[in-house]
Amino acid sequence: MADDSLLLNFSLGDNNIIQPETKLKGGTWRDRLSAKKIAKHHAKGPRTAGDEDSAPRAPRNPNRIEVPSSRPTKRQRTDGGDSGKQQSHGHPHSNQPRQFISSLFTKNPEPQKAEEVKEEGHVENAKPTNAPLIDGLDTFTNLGLSPNLAAHLLTKLELKAPTAIQKASISQLLKEEGDAFIQAETGSGKTLAYLLPLVQRIMALSKPGAQTDATGQPIVHRDSGLFAIVLAPTRELCKQISVVLENLLRCAHWIVAGTVIGGEKKKSEKARLRKGLNILVATPGRLADHLDNTQALDVSNVRWLVLDEGDRLMELGFEEEIQGIVKKLDARQRPSRIPGIPARRTTILCSATLKMSVQKLGEISLKDAVHIKADPEDEDEKARRSKAEESAYRVPAQLKQSYAVVAAKLRLVTLTAFFKRTFMRKGSVMKAIIFVSCADSVDFHFEVFTRKQVKEDGGEPSDTDKSEEKPPSSPHGTIAPATAFSNPSNPVTLFRLHGSLPQNVRTSTLGAFAKNKEASVLICTDVASRGLDLPNVDLVVEYDPAFSAEDHLHRIGRTARVGRDGRALIFLQPGCEENYVEVLKRGYRDGGKALTRADANEILKRGFGGNVESGNKDWETKATDWQCEVERWALENPEYLEMARRAFQSHIRAYATHIAAERSMFNIKELHLGHLAKAFALRDRPSKINVPGLRQGKEETKKDFKAERNSAAGKKRKAGGADLADDIPSANNTATAAQKMRAKMKEHMAGANEFNLA
């Protein structure tokens, strides 16, 4: 052809040169497509300088794919105009772990249900439903108790009149010898309701006079045998029953009581059993063990068996143990030579609720039992109700209960602000209990509230401040001053309690909290929610909602006991948890009119010193500073950071264990894990905390797969082309390495410019 040797030389501008398309490798086709679009976007011409609205935005690149820059144009710029402003579109710090510090007061979900916020002072005081009777005729003597025991109750225990359930049960159990089921609300005195008839009957067996031996001593003494057994679900409840029983038996010193519970040495328990006991308080597991392995335990004379907290006994899985205990007591029962002792055994079942599990326990242990309630006049009305309504729990009428809808990020600061306000004035509240869901959360919050505080000026506490904040002696680390919400005029002591602590530590901590005369707070799990009668508890805070409505009843039942006033507050999160308010209302006789709502912002304002009436936002700054200080404290101490992560993980696992009927209100899929992590002073992404039991999302699974694939491909390339890596010299620091890399790139670019046309 004639035109084969034709050469054309066109003069084109820099902007008209068609640059070769950059080929992207690695990743999925979706990622390559998005990276290709990003490259085309940057290949467009620059925007006008005066167009502020068209300022380029940072491209969204969640997978952080490095987009290679385009090849240089025909000639390099030598004027140095805007070359220094060009920045790499990659992420230079992508290999370093990123921490995100989110604001406390932004992007928080709003409550779905807007209700009127009532002040607690506007709530009418209700008549106590579990208080002692004020009628002068209803005394312990009129119920059938001996004058000696009634006088002991009046003078030593300062009990002037019985409660409604005590009046109904004492008269019934002293009059008849049949089985009984005692049902009453929490804090109404059920322990004395069955202990007083028990002690009265054993005292009648040993009454001086005709029933004495040759020396004039009562026939019944510690060697006479075991007459009564009291079973309780927890060790703490057994200890409390034992203390009440010992106080009662001070008027009958010849009757001996003892305990056998888990966590103590069996050798010492066997020694006590060999010496002889008349009344035994035990946990089901340890009693079943002694019945099988201890020959000194003689149960042939046992005529009274009490099952306290029957619903909890079934929830903890003691059905088989109790069934075995009842069978062994029936098989080993023998006629007694002691005059006046009943021919058959009397079984008493106590429970605040009447659930199917309690009914099943009654079928195992009770025979023709009488149902004892505090309000017998309402029996006909209750009989017409359905079974679900029969088993509904009731809250003491004098208990002032409220709830606060708090966003996940604000939970920790709101709890701190609430107790700052609570203990601002000395004497307003003496004792309070905080219930959380798991033991790891107890340990973390205990360390947060007892850590060394940083002054507002940023300095460390002085020696005088340290001397004023000396904690009480606690060799086990369960007692410390609550520096987070103490003040110079009202120091507060913090106690911690959970089931993972050794038994001796749990007993000593609980005893120290009960005996403390100053302001104190107990942070604990549900191990302290059942049956414990802790004196002067004015406030109960459910920081984590209970796993069932019955557990909620027992939690708030630690206050407002035996006619005393009490307050309770529960924390709920916006969303599906707000439906739990209807469950709370069902526990009231008036349909929940006494249930009030507390505003979370008002709690923060009052706690962090802001003026509620004005629009000043100083309280937000103080709350944010306090939260950031806790987060820095956790980051600076690896031990506490690991403790926070464990608490977060355990909290998520515990959140998924709500009962099936309430799981729609506590849906783990609707939890914002990132916001919730901030309540544990964590700045890590939840995906990096590795929460066991949670499935990874699609994006996280895809990232993990690509990371493994890229690492494997990198190893292959490194094995096959190790000599290429030697072209880039190594450096000791990042700055030197970057400088040498730029020099290497200039060499490659200089070689490419030699082949430019024109």
Curated annotation (Swiss-Prot):
Originating species: Aspergillus fumigatus (strain ATCC MYA-4609 / CBS 101355 / FGSC A1100 / Af293) (Neosartorya fumigata)
A single Gene Ontology CC term: nucleus
InterPro entries given in the database record: DEAD/DEAH_box_helicase_dom (IPR011545), Helicase_ATP-bd (IPR014001), Helicase_C-like (IPR001650), P-loop_NTPase (IPR027417), SPB4-like_CTE (IPR025313)
Family: Belongs to the DEAD box helicase family. DDX31/DBP7 subfamily.
Full protein name: ATP-dependent RNA helicase dbp7
Pfam families: CTE_SPB4 (PF13959), DEAD (PF00270), Helicase_C (PF00271)
Residues involved in ATP binding: 184-191
Keywords, in A-Z order: ATP-binding, Helicase, Hydrolase, Nucleotide-binding, Nucleus, Ribosome biogenesis, RNA-binding, rRNA processing
Organism ancestry: Eukaryota, Fungi, Dikarya, Ascomycota, Pezizomycotina
